[in-house]
């Protein structure tokens, strides 16, 4: 099986459509379909900050749950939106406010449809996907070699948030260790979460979050070709979001 793994979309539907078309997908049915049966995989954070979060929920639900033709690994923003939809006490900030504004603008029956679709998508998707006979792992923020196969709380925190130190940057964002430098595994780890100006290949890992929602690019990785394809963002460039990885 061949896959096209898509970086953090964050509600940037137009960029997603542009990227999938560039990757050879046809949208005539209203969904991206590849003539060679390639499958899409998502590294999570499909919502928040961008203009079309609900559209992305509907598309990914359709591909992953209804048609079972794609793979989705949730990100930290997905986890927070899931908790919001469950009625938990979450702070509606750091991007969630844009998704909530879209959601609250809907009539109540459409709100229920979106909520049920996202809850189903989240609950029926694993923390990470092990694909191609364990040769590639698709996850949100990365995974250590010794965590592969585990799904406990410690691993969940790592996969959703990265290798956080507990410290904070001046803007309040968490300081993260560069776990990819220490990775010695044979499986490719394809992930996102931390915006980088260009896809970052370190050992057998590649970060494909190229900051689409911050004016960078939306990137897809063609696997097993290991070729990255990007399209430019239509949003304003926010330079401080592309911080060097410590």
From Swiss-Prot:
* Catalytic reactions on record: P(1),P(4)-bis(5'-guanosyl) tetraphosphate + H2O = GMP + GTP + 2 H(+)
The superkingdom listed in its UniProt entry is Bacteria
What EC designation does it have?
3.6.1.17
What's an example of a GO molecular-function annotation for this chain? bis(5'-nucleosyl)-tetraphosphatase (asymmetrical) activity
Among Pfam families, the record links this protein to: Metallophos (PF00149)
For this record, the Gene Ontology CC terms, alphabetical, are:
cytoplasm
* HAMAP family (alphabetical): PrpE
Function noted in UniProt? Asymmetrically hydrolyzes Ap4p to yield AMP and ATP.
State the name under which the record lists this protein.
Answer: Bis(5'-nucleosyl)-tetraphosphatase PrpE [asymmetrical]
The organism is Bacillus cereus (strain B4264)
Lineage of source species: Bacteria, Bacillati, Bacillota, Bacilli, Bacillales
């Amino acid at each position: 099986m061949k896959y096209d793994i898509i970086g953090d979309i964050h509600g940037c539907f137009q960029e997603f459509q542009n990227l999938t078309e560039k990757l050879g997908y046809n949208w005539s049915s209203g969904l991206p379909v590849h003539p060679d049966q390639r499958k899409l995989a998502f590294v999570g954070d499909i919502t928040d900050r961008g203009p079309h979060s609900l559209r992305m929920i509907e598309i990914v639900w359709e591909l992953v749950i209804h048609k079972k033709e794609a793979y989705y690994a949730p990100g930290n923003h997905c986890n927070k939106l899931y908790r919001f939809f469950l009625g938990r006490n979450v702070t509606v900030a750091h991007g969630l406010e844009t998704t909530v504004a879209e959601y609250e603008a809907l009539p109540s029956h459409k709100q229920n449809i979106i909520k049920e679709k996202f809850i189903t998508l989240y609950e029926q998707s694993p923390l990470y996907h092990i694909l191609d006979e364990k040769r590639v792992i698709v996850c949100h923020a990365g995974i250590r070699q010794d965590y592969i196969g585990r799904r406990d709380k410690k691993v969940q925190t790592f996969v959703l948030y990265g290798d956080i130190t507990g410290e904070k940057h001046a803007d309040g964002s968490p300081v993260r260790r560069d776990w990819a430098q220490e990775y010695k595994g044979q499986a490719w780890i394809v992930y996102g979460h931390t915006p980088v100006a260009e896809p970052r290949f370190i050992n057998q890992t590649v970060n494909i979050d190229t900051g689409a929602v911050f004016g960078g690019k939306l990137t897809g990785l063609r696997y097993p070709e290991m070729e990255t394809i990007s399209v430019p963002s239509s949003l304003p460039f926010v330079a401080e979001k592309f911080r060097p990885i410590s």
